[in-house]
Structure formats: structure tokens, C-alpha cells
Amino acid sequence: IALLDRPGMEVILINAMIQTILKEGLEDKTFIEERTEGITELKEEITALQPQISGMMESNKNEVEKAARIFTQAKRAMILIGSGLWSHLEPKDIAIASSNLALVTGHMGKESCGVLILLEKCNSQGAVDMGFFSEREGNGRKYLLQKASEEKLMALYLIGENPLVSSPVLGRQALEKVSLLIVQDLFMTETAKMAHVVLPACSFVEKEGTYTNLERRVQKLIPFRPPLHQSKSDFDIFLSLLRLLEYPIQGETPEAVFEEIGRDLSHYRGIQDGEQWPKGSPYLYAEGFPNGKAKLIPVNGGLTHQKPEGYPFHLIQRPSLFQSGLLSSKSDTLKRVSEKLYLEMNPEDGKRLKVEDEEVVKVSTQDGRFLRMKVKYSSRPVSGVITAPYPCSLIEERDIETVKVEKLKII
């Protein structure tokens, strides 16, 4: 059942499903009483949101209620959160709202149940486990690039990142301001060409380590061959830098580092190749939650990107199999089958603007940035929404931009 009407309505949609479940008494009362806390506060918030939910969900009220009943009555149900067609305005709120939905229906701590956040890379879960996505101030690519562009950060050490492509506007502003740019990468990327120092890294077939996938399965990576030419594994590059800095090193092999991880992260302790963390746990929370009971946290996110006068479209990025092309563009075969650059536009909007399918248009932001791209009619975006493949130069960090679309004048 397709429910999402437009970007920014994810949390409202989930709250609408919870509202139906509570109103019709479909919640798992035993599970809520024994394994959660905060149900009273959640009910109060959902009741207070009634006008907002009704206004936003009026067009597909029946479908939302149907989906809520199906989800509740399912023996096993899982929520998958991906980048999808719509960009996430508040990813944390979406995750919390999804957890609320899973908890009130008892779809947590059981086989084939729960909430899974689908991340981009094969080892993204491993990066999360190591604390790479901390919420502390000073973390995050956009934050660091912003500080560098303001000349509040004078040195950048980039590993496997190419902000000139993934964040072209902010990336160039930042890289032109730093006094020292170090790039560690497999390729001589656009960003690497601007670097003061380039550290050549080898590929995954030449290094040892582990991958942790979404099901928390830790898999060992065995090198197929030695690093080519003067390249080194990321681990060996870090070791070389630590030695130059005369920093005390506790472990000089991947095995020693993995043992250290196990000492600091108890759920990694004793894990062998192919096992899931924590050891002996095919799914999480079967025996209970870390703090005893799971907390239901009310969230009330909504459409925060209003369309200013004269800019009637929401421009969002749609996921692309080839992403920025950092790896895929190195293959002639992949380049032949790669996605062509075009804007997806609802046919109703195209006809209103008198823009033909396959016609090139100009897309502009309020601050004067623009691009020209061919239009492709599609029923996927609703009227008022257009999509461009990731990465789009008008959008930074997978957000949403308000834009206007104009026919090109023929002189």
C-alpha cells in the first residue's frame, strides 16, 4: 500500500497509524505493560496531534487505517527505513516514530520483527558500532565542511571522501579555505587533486579487517593480494602516522585491534567470523531491553520546508545505484548502463508549465543557484515535487530544496 504523499510527512504518517491502532484498541496491551514505559505520554501526544494528522492524511485516510490494521494483525512485521524516493528531513524522529509503532504492536524482540535502518555501504553498520555517527557537536561531514568554509577549521584529513562531487557548493567553499588538506583515497579524485598531501590507499581486495552488515553479522575480510605499487591499507597508513607522531601503539595487527574493540564494546567480545553480535543473539531484545523497559518517545515532526512565493516545487534527490560515480565511473561497462541525468516530474506539473517530456528546463533556487536538466515525466513524484539523481548540485547532504522550474527561452 503506497501511503506517503509528499516529503516531510513520514512522522505524521506513522503517528496516524499509531492513532488508528490506539483508537481501535489494536495495540498489544500485554507487551506494552510488561516491556515498555511512556504509553500515557504517547497517547496524550497522539490525541493532541489529531487536527494535524487529520489535515495531512485526509486524502488517504482509508489506506492509512488499512495499513495500520494489517501491520498490527501480522504475526511478524518489520519496519525498514531507507533513503527511498523521499529525502528525510528528520531521520532521528522517523526512527523514533517507527520504534513507537513497533513497540505498541509488540513487533520488537521477536524473530523477523523490529526496525532496521538501511544504510548505504556494506560496512555502514560497523561504522555505527564504532561510533562514527555520534551526535556530539563536531561530528559529521556537513558540520566540518561548514566550519572549514567559515575558516574556523584550518586542516582537513579526508578518508575516502570526495566532497567536490558529493557536496559541490559547500565542498569547494571549504577546501579553498583550509591551510592543510590531506586526502587518503584509492583514486586521484577531484578532491585529491586539491590536496596538499595525498596518501594512496589500497582497495578492499588488498586489506584485512571485518565487515558488519545490517543483521549484525561480523565477517572477516581476507586480502587477495598485496597492495599495488606504493599504496597501503588504511590500517597501515594509520600505523605509519602514529609512529611518526611517536604515539604509543597498543596493537599493530588487525587481530590485536579487533581484540581491543572487544574489550571496549562488550557485544563484540568473543565474536568469530560469521557470527552476530552479541554472541548467540539471532535477533535483539528477546530477553528484554538494555534499560529494562523500552521507552515510548512522542515525536511530532512535520512539513518544515514551506514553499516561498514563486518557488512552488520541492526538489529532492532520488537514490542512484551509481551514487557519485567515485567507483562505478571507473568501469566502462557500468558507465554504459548508468542512469541518465534527468528530472522526474509529474505529468500534471509538466502540462501546467507547458514543458514537454524530454525537454530541457532551468531549475533555480532562491539564492540564485541553478542547473539545466532534461525532464522525464513520471507518476512517482506527486504534483509539486520533482526529483533529481544523487548527488544534485542544488542540494547539500540529502536535504530538500524549494525551487522554481522554467522553460528555456529560445532566442
Task: Describe the predicted segments one by one.
Residues 31, 211-232:
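P-loop/Walker A phosphate-binding loop and immediately adjacent motor/lid segment at beta-alpha junctions
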Residues 63-67, 141-143, 297-303, 329-330:
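Glycine-rich, charged/polar anion/phosphate-binding loops
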Residues 82, 288, 299, 316-319, ...:
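Structured loops at beta-to-helix junctions and adjacent beta-edge loops in soluble globular domains
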Residues 222-281, 328-344, 348-411:
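Long, contiguous, secondary-structure-rich segments that constitute the structural scaffold
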Residues 308-337:
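C-terminal accessory/binding modules appended to enzymatic or scaffolding proteins
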